[in-house]
């Protein structure tokens, strides 16, 4: 039926057997069949057809059958569907059908049809539909009111009939009267008996505590009051319908006329608790009584009435009404012989239940904020009321409460989903908290997005389509006179030209040729304070220029040499007078512009050429100034000082050796001897005691100073605890040579000492020295002559010249210069350059790089300021043979003493140029030069 388009005429023809001529359903069976077809209907045409058939049907039996079969539920489904789809014609048809059906309150309670219709009456957009729905709602409200009012009326009629029957039969049949009474009052009595029995139990219980079981005996005697009690209860059953709140005081007043007076004011109490009382009272009556009476028998009932002091007096008299009641009520139960048993059973059944109430009654106490006495009264009275409440309460409920409840529901459903609501209005704290959480999450997500946003283009840019604009109808400024005035003005004014580009770029590079600075000759008087030194240890490294301006043109080596020569032109340099530095430089470099300094440095024999040219002038002796120390070459002339000596300052002797650094990390020239040293520096014999003397040295001099010497004004230190300043004697006199770079080499005891550059080896005790550069003659070996007159080492080896005249012995290896100027003489090993560290000549041993460290065995001499390095005694004599062992050169190396290393007044030294230019010196307190305010008084 629901597949293709439906023709209503065809549909009616198919249903013709069930319908009469007017389209009305003929029989009850026909409506069942039509209902089954309606369930299958999906199209709007067929549904409207069926609804019209129902509208034509007038028979209430058929319509009631339709509702009972399920037609009302089906219409509810159709109504819901059409409301969601907002199908207004179908909605109107359904509302008309609902209006036509004979619906009752029970039918309306089955589903939410009434609510839907109510919503349509309020919120429908179609005015006709709203009117129709409101009419239907008003009809249904009338049905509800009529039914709720008819029900209690019918019940009252039944009651009156029963009572009338019982009364009329009284004179005729006294026996039947009792039965009729009991039957007529069965329903109320049964309900009443339970509460009454409860009432009896409660006071009996209370009195049981006080007086015992006496209550039960008097209760059987006064039977006469039966009628009066029944009449009173009947009166209350009939008249006071809104007694639902009376439970508080109803029970005590049941038996006595004063109770009537109490009832009336209590009737005015609000009805809000009607339903609650009906629900709560049935389970509680016995529980409250037993528990509360047991707790408080007499005094508590006085407090029971609600916070009103006036009411205390009637409550005080209430125990007597209870007693009276207990007596009367059993009598009421007595006339019917078969019934007394059930009340007793109820009592017995309730009594065991009394322990339970303690749980529930306290709750009532808390909620009502009443003392137990008040509650005591409540449950006692409530049993009397529940009968009235249940019967009358239901009637009343059907009349009034459904309406109020509907109003409440209607108010709730007024907020329809289709209704416009202010969404942004915060309803409660929960909503506010939700919004807060959402806003926080949103803020966090945006922050995270922004933090990870690399500003990359996500959507490719698309060129917008060009807009084709129509030509303007009016040319702007066509009638303007100002443009002519401006044109005339521009004829007599220079045009403003802006030649620079619109978008700025980097400025054009300006070509320029660096002009070499002019070479200014050194001033001999001023050069004393400008002793340069070089940061790096490589021979090709850039050195500080002696004059700041002229040196920038020279290669570093020449700059160093110039500085050293300039520094050496002091009053104590006898051989320096006849040297013209400018001529030497010109001869070395050729014409100033012929070769750049870089090309000169790349020549392999460049440094050798310089040395060969400088040797005849006696300039080679100082050695490379690159390390800050102009070491005295082995053949250097004695008078060739390379620094202006201070008063009593130390002076390097000609006996070779770089003289050793004067302390840890100490740069600068070594101090000259004080007042000459006849032992080492004989007058007129520059080589005396030097490395060229192979014979035994002069007489023993056990306490000669180490190479470092003492500070300018220091007193000579006491002799060290170890024997001999140059190393321990091993069976002979002290060595007369200064072996090793700054360290005395043990020459005795069968050790074959290893000589450093310029170190003359003592040949005492028949020891054969190993010939280093400038060493003594080896046995049968013819030493080669090194520059500066020092003889090369033995064994046919031609030593290489270390720059500055220190010749390293050994197999053709060119030693590297340590900053102390001493050259390691080991087999080609490069000693580790610690500033001021004496380099061991060991074969393969790298001496420790501490300041003033000793020789091959790794012994660290004590670098106490002003003390000589002690002779750390090595292995026993004859254990090591020269280069053979791991500690070449014997075990008696001593380190440099710390003559000038720490403290002391350096004001008699030249001012440190580095300190004056940069404000600090990289050698800090170990610098050999004068730092004003640090190692001497500040400058004036």
Swiss-Prot record:
Annotated crosslink Glycyl lysine isopeptide (Lys-Gly) (interchain with G-Cter in SUMO2) location: 179, 262
Region annotation Interaction with WDR82: where it falls in the sequence: 418-619
Chain intervals for the UniProt region annotation (Necessary for interaction with PPP1CC): 393-408
Swiss-Prot/TrEMBL keywords: Chromosome, DNA-binding, Isopeptide bond, Metal-binding, Methylation, Nucleus, Phosphoprotein, RNA-binding, Ubl conjugation, Zinc, Zinc-finger
Subcellular location: Nucleus; Chromosome
Biased composition (Pro residues): 644-655
Pfam families from the UniProt entry: Med26, zf-CCCH
One GO process term, biological-process aspect: negative regulation of transcription elongation by RNA polymerase II
Region Interaction with TOX4: start-end pairs: 1-348
Biased composition (Basic and acidic residues): 153-166, 174-196, 861-886, 894-903
Note on domains (UniProt): The TFIIS N-terminal domain specifically recognizes disordered sequences in protein substrates that are then dephosphorylated by PPP1CA (or PPP1CB or PPP1CC).
Quaternary structure annotation from Swiss-Prot or TrEMBL: Component of the PNUTS-PP1 complex (also named PTW/PP1 complex), composed of PPP1R10/PNUTS, TOX4, WDR82, and PPP1CA (or PPP1CB or PPP1CC).
Annotated protein name in UniProt: Serine/threonine-protein phosphatase 1 regulatory subunit 10
Organism name: Pan troglodytes
């Amino acid at each position: 039926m629901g597949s293709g388009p439906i023709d209503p005429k065809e549909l009616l023809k198919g249903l013709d057997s069930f319908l009469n001529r007017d389209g009305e359903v003929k029989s009850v069976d026909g409506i069942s069949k039509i209902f089954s077809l309606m369930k299958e209907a999906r199209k709007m045409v067929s549904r409207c057809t069926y609804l019209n058939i129902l509208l034509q049907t007038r028979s209430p039996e058929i319509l009631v059958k339709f509702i009972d079969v399920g037609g009302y539920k089906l219409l509810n489904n159709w109504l819901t569907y059409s409301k969601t789809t907002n199908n207004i014609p179908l909605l109107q048809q359904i509302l008309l059908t609902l209006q036509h059906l004979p619906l009752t309150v029970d039918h309306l309670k089955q589903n939410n049809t009434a609510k839907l219709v109510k919503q349509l009456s309020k919120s429908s957009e179609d005015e006709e539909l709203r009117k129709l729905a409101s009419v239907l709602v008003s009809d249904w409200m009338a049905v509800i009111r009529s039914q709720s009012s008819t029900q209690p009326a019918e019940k009252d009629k039944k009651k009156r009939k029963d009572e009338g029957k019982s009364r009329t039969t009284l004179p005729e049949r006294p026996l039947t009267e009792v039965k009729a009474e009991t039957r007529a009052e069965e329903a109320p009595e049964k309900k009443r008996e339970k509460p009454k029995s409860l009432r009896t139990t409660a006071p009996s219980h209370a009195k049981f505590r006080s007086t015992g079981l006496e209550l039960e005996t008097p209760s059987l005697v006064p039977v006469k009051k039966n009628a009066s009690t029944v009449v009173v209860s009947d009166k209350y059953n009939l008249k006071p319908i809104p007694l639902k709140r009376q439970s508080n005081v109803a029970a005590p007043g049941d038996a006595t006329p004063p109770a009537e007076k109490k009832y009336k004011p209590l009737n005015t109490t609000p009805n809000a608790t009607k339903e609650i009382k009906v629900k709560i009272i049935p389970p509680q009556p016995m529980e409250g009584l037993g528990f509360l009476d047991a707790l408080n028998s007499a005094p508590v009932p006085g407090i029971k009435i609600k916070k009103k002091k006036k009411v205390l007096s009637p409550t005080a008299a209430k125990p007597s009404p209870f007693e009276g009641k207990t007596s009367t009520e059993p009598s009421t139960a007595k006339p019917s012989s078969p019934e007394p048993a059930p009340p007793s059973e109820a009592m017995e059944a309730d009594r065991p239940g009394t322990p339970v109430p303690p749980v529930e009654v306290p709750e009532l106490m808390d909620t009502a904020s009443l003392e137990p006495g008040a509650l005591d009264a409540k449950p006692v009275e409530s049993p009397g009321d529940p009968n009235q409440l249940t019967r009358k309460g239901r009637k009343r409920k059907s009349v009034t409460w459904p309406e109020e409840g509907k109003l409440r529901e209607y108010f709730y459903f007024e907020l329809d989903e289709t209704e416009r609501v202010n969404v942004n209005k915060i309803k409660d704290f929960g909503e506010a908290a939700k919004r807060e959480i959402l806003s926080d999450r949103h803020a966090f997500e945006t922050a995270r997005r922004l933090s990870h946003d690399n500003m990359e283009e996500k959507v490719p840019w698309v060129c917008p389509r060009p807009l084709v604009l129509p030509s303007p109808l009016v040319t702007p400024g066509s009638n303007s006179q100002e443009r002519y005035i401006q044109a005339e003005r521009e004829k007599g004014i220079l045009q403003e030209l802006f030649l620079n580009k619109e978008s700025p770029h980097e400025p054009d590079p300006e070509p320029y040729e660096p002009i070499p600075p002019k070479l200014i000759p050194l001033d001999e008087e001023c050069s004393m304070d400008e002793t340069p030194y070089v940061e790096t240890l490589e021979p090709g490294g850039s050195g500080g220029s002696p004059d700041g301006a002229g040196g920038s043109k020279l290669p570093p080596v020449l700059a160093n040499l110039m500085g050293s020569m300039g520094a050496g032109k002091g009053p104590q340099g006898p051989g320096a007078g006849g040297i013209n530095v400018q001529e030497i430089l010109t001869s070395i470099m050729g014409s100033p512009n012929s070769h750049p300094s870089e090309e000169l440095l790349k020549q392999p024999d460049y440094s050798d050429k310089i040395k060969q040219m400088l040797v005849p002038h006696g300039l080679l002796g100082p050695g490379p100034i690159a390390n800050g120390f102009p070491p005295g070459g082995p053949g250097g002339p004695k008078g060739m000082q390379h620094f202006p000596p201070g008063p009593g300052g130390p002076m390097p002797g000609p006996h070779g050796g770089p003289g050793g650094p004067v302390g840890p990390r100490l740069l600068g020239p070594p101090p000259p001897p004080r007042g000459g040293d006849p032992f080492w520096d004989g007058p007129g014999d520059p080589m005396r005691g030097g490395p060229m003397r192979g014979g035994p040295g002069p007489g023993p001099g056990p306490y000669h100073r180490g190479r470092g010497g003492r500070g300018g004004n220091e007193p000579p230190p006491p002799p060290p605890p170890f024997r001999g300043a140059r190393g321990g004697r091993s069976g002979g006199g002290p060595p007369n040579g200064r072996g090793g770079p700054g360290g005395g080499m043990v020459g005795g005891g069968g050790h074959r000492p290893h000589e450093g550059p310029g170190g003359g080896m003592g040949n005492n005790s028949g020891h054969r020295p190993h010939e280093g550069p400038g060493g003594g003659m080896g046995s049968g070996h013819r030493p080669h002559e090194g520059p500066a007159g020092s003889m090369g080492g033995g064994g046919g080896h031609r030593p290489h010249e270390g720059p500055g005249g220190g010749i390293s012995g050994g197999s053709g290896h060119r030693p590297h210069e340590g900053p102390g100027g001493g050259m390691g003489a080991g087999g080609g090993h490069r000693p580790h350059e610690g500033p001021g560290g004496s380099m061991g000549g060991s074969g393969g041993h790298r001496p420790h790089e501490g300041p003033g460290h000793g020789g091959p065995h790794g012994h660290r001499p004590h670098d106490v300021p002003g003390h000589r390095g002690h002779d750390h005694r090595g292995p026993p004599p004859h254990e090591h043979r020269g280069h053979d062992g791991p500690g070449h050169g014997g075990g008696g190396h001593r380190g440099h003493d710390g003559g000038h290393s720490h403290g002391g007044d350096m004001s008699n030294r030249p001012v440190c140029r580095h300190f004056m230019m940069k404000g600090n010196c990289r050698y800090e307190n170990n610098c050999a030069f004068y730092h004003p305010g640090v190692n001497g008084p500040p400058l004036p």
